[in-house]
Amino acid sequence: MEPSLFYNHSTKKANQMLGMIWCNLRGCSERLVHAFVSSHLDYCNSLLAGLPISYLSPLQRIQNTAARMITLTRKHDHISPILRSLHWLPVHSRITFKILLLVYKITHNIAPQYLQDLVSLRASSSTRFLRSSSSMQLIHGPRTKTRYGDRAFSSIAPKLWNRLPPHIQNAPSIETFKNLLKTYLFNLQ
């Protein structure tokens, strides 16, 4: 899929919704932005994993504008504290969050079968105790020869998952996992 086609459509729709909200409701509620803008930003965003920041910057600008609308802050105010106060991750971290949430569902058998077929858990064949034995590690697929192949879910998901600390991987519930993961991603920035 040509990246510019996806970006043009996705960015255009999110920008239209943002413009509609901006014209009609100054200081709009966060709920409206989530309903009309965030849904377009999150639509198929796992396809955007591994793209350069230059491709993600239009989506990030839309998110920044939405955050400024909600908080009624000026255009030139620094955006990081605003996003943090709203508990919003930047676009590249949102993409990582969504991918890791899918992997959590895969490792706990609550994802559809077609997703479970894309990644597999590493079997603990050793009888020795290893630090990594308490965590669920995923097997990396064969290395591809293209950048597009390296961005595939089956390639990027194990890389992201295996970098997570074990206490996040072994979260007892999906809500706990989301909270721990969001905190972890906020602290990486």
Predicted segments with their positions:
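Hydrophobic/basic alpha-helical segments
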Residues: 1-189
